From Swiss-Prot:
Protein name: Dynein axonemal assembly factor 10
Coiled-coil intervals, chain numbering: none
Entry GO MF terms: ubiquitin binding
Record keyword Cell membrane present: no
The organism of origin for this protein: Dictyostelium discoideum
Main location: other
Gene: dnaaf10
Gene3D superfamilies with a match to the protein in the record: YVTN repeat-like/Quinoprotein amine dehydrogenase (2.130.10.10)
Function text: Key assembly factor specifically required for the stability of axonemal dynein heavy chains in cytoplasm.
Subunit structure: Interacts with PIH1D1; the interaction associates DNAAF10 with the R2TP complex. Interacts with several dynein axonemal assembly factors.
Residue windows of the WD repeats: 80-127, 132-170, 184-223, 277-321
One GO term describing the cellular component: dynein axonemal particle
Length: 357
């Protein structure tokens, strides 16, 4: 395992990653993503009211103050729901920079329910499944316009097609909807992370298991074990997620992996130490959708010390910025405006970062 070098937050004397604006929230967000074709960010999480935990959805728009011209985050939507939310995903495309008309997103909550929302009018879900999992849904990923893959604390992974409407005629909350595929985990370890397209699923678990599933044959294609719980998985190519994917863990290391179906179904790993503390959690890692020329990949990670760090594909540190004094839980690149990232922290903060990469 390689160790990464120190950084002074500069590259050739210039700041690369900058904390542009931060706003304190009234609820604890657990996931954030940019709304396609907008300057708005949706956050989902938990809000405590009268000692009762409820679900919370907020939408903030990046704007500029009329007088000072300073950036600000303006709350344009907020609502409470019955169950606290754990995760969210917009529908990803094979070409991540392709203009997206689909502004719908999927949420997973702590009560095992998945719901589809229209980000323009998200007071009531337009589709959903109650009891998709027993207990919390820890990870969710959506692809194309209809494919939803979710993983839960119960150790199972389920695949849904939003074109299949609920059998119940009462509402769109899908009391009787069935998954099109289900994958069981023998040891029932919590599924923490999912990355999918219409061919494969890569799933990471709390106990370090990393499984690859084939959606065409509804079977497990490969399995291996890492020395740490797998917090997030992201691919540099959504059309072929197995070609190269980034794994972050709760043991202070990341791994850049690839799967060669012609190489005895083996997954090849390059592991890198990130933090000096041996058990610091790296909550999230994502590839930049913008920097693809000359086969150069750039990725950004959210760290347990409250910092956000940007790396080249060879794990050379580009820049690092301290955003909070508590862990960064989630981050996302804007697919419409190059250089914009959003992230949330355990300190109930939403931050917008800017970078030329």
């Amino acid at each position: 395992m390689s160790a990464l070098g120190e950084s002074n937050n500069k590259q050739n004397g210039k700041e690369i990653l900058h904390n542009y604006v931060t706003k304190k929230l009234t609820s604890q967000p657990y996931s954030c993503q940019w709304i396609p074709t907008s300057c708005s960010v949706v956050t989902v999480g938990k809000k405590t009211s009268g000692g009762i935990s409820k679900g919370d959805i907020k939408i903030h728009q990046l704007e500029f103050d009329d007088t000072s011209g300073d950036p600000k985050l303006n709350l344009v939507y907020e609502n409470e729901f019955t169950n606290p939310f754990r995760c969210l995903s917009f529908f990803k495309q094979a070409n991540q920079l392709q203009q997206q008309d689909n502004r719908k997103f999927i949420t997973g909550d702590f009560n095992g329910q998945i719901s589809e929302w229209d980000s323009d009018i998200c007071d009531i879900p337009i589709w959903g499944v109650k009891g998709a999992h027993q207990g919390s849904i820890s990870a969710i990923d959506a692809y194309a316009d209809n494919l939803v893959v979710c993983g839960g604390k119960d150790g199972t992974i389920k695949v849904y097609d939003t074109r299949i409407k609920p059998n119940s005629a009462n509402d769109n909350n899908g009391n009787n909807s069935s998954p099109i595929s289900t994958f069981e985990q023998t040891n029932k370890s919590n599924c923490w992370s999912i990355c999918t397209n219409d061919n494969n699923i890569i799933a990471g678990f709390e106990n370090g298991d990393l499984n690859i599933y084939n959606l065409k044959t509804n079977s497990i294609q490969s399995t291996t074990k890492l020395n740490g719980g797998i917090c997030s998985i992201d691919s540099n190519d959504r059309s072929n997620i197995l070609n190269q994917f980034l794994i972050t863990t709760n043991k202070s290391f990341i791994s850049i992996a690839s799967f060669n179906n012609n190489n005895n179904n083996n997954i090849e790993f390059k592991d890198y130490d990130i933090n000096k503390e041996p058990n610091q959690t790296i909550w999230s890692g994502i590839y930049s959708p913008w920097n693809k020329k000359d086969n150069e990949n750039i990725f950004t990670i959210a760290q347990g010390d409250g910092s956000v760090s940007m790396y080249r594909d060879d794990c050379k540190l580009i820049d690092k910025v301290l955003v909070s004094d508590l862990p960064i839980l989630s981050l996302d690149y804007s697919k419409d405006r190059k250089g914009l990232l959003c992230c949330i922290s355990l300190k109930k903060q939403l931050s917008i970062l800017i970078s030329p990469c």
